[in-house]
Amino acid sequence: MQPPFRLFGAELSPYSVKVRSYLRYKGIAHEWIQRSAARQEEFSRYAKLPLIPVLVGADDQAMQDSTPIIEALEAAFPEPALQPQDSGLAFLSALLEDYADEWLNKAMFHYRWTYPADQESAARRIVAMMFDGGEPPAGLEDSVRSRMAGRLHH
């Protein structure tokens, strides 16, 4: 994969923001593309699964899943290094990344979808991003809210 890159993602996706932060840290040229109904056809050309982020290179090669994306980019763009040189610190860094990736999102989802005011706010923002300011179908916010809140296991 070669730059410039196109990154399909969403502001509310911790995995999308993780890859965008990495690209900014490295100074790697990229275009942020908000995944939305208007961009669905383009997104579908590259996505193997309906999940974000999707990173597309100038060669039209695409990757999904934030950790493998960053690992591939780190191999291609090693400076500045993401991981410390010291093996002990590198281990701790990898451990923290894995913990944050796999477990801290549970706290994020809890606070986004447990309390009614947060549910309403998150559903409203998700629907607004999906339709880029266009008119969404009636009841979509309620549908998103009930679907996502129903996924929590308390």
Where are these regions (language model features)?
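A conserved mid-domain beta-alpha-beta active-site/ligand-binding segment of alpha/beta enzyme cores
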Residues: 138-154
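GST-like domain detector, emphasizing the conserved glutathione-binding G-site
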Residues: 1-139
